[in-house]
């Protein structure tokens, strides 16, 4: 009796600690396959509920038989005779082999039907075409028919089919935005494609779903779905370069951008920066996030990203340039000026606000998206 009490107390303690840990976690944007935003996701959700229903039914039957056996055993626990044995019972063995096969066959039909509906049709001719390349640890987005190049944020109009031509630039990745489509693996040397039609406006969060290195968990992306009018305005703005910086601090940052070698890896539309080893920064000032969806796009976060790149995102190809606080402030001020001309993307997004995040390095981000001063000191110590 004493042993049972100890085990019960330990169980309560574990549950309490687990609940406390969950309560202490910040509110993360958690995409769900059940909160569908496209016909493709609806097919997957319907199949999920069908399989879940069968699973619950099977579980209920198994638990019912187990309960009956336990109750029967308790009633007969004072009897010495051996209970009936089923070993070698051919009828029972055939039954518990055939019944699961029947259940699997029943589930196979809607599964194959859903796969055919999702992958058996070509994208409509009016589909928006975007080339997506997964790289450690970010996403390159190219609109070939529009001449637009961006990174980590896929912008599309509501109600229009979107065809994604998927490829990997280094190792295996998997493209996944749960609310609009299933996973598609990206294998080096292979071209893949998928398409979907977003049904509502908003921001939908995605993630690389294939372990691809140290910062796999930090390889995020966002699908920004706009109204047709806002999308047309975004296209017109994205096809134009950002205005030259007028502020003295930003102008100094533009010079440092060249002097520190940033120009060797990053393209900026309208200036002599065409290399695309890293993300295109032409309109980074208008994006909702930086570091592939890890941090909200604020000047404070940009400064910390520039100074502590390899600490915020371990394994990233971007080198730590050893920038001083003043140098990082100037470059961040310059990057902040690289905005979409005459278009405010954040204002066009419905219901988008500051999110709480914890990056995979373990450094928490507060409500404004800025790392705490304690964590900054920790990062400086790591260097």
Labelled PLM ranges:
Residues 55:
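Globin-like tetrapyrrole-binding proteins
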Residues 1-12:
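N-terminal membrane topogenic signal
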Residues 2-3, 20-50, 63, 70-276, ...:
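Non-transmembrane, membrane-proximal soluble domains of secreted or membrane proteins
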Residues 12-21:
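Core hydrophobic alpha-helical transmembrane segments of single-pass membrane proteins
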Residues 286-290:
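A short, flexible beta-alpha/helix-coil linker loop
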Residues 58-62:
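Seven-transmembrane alpha-helical bundle of G-protein-coupled receptors
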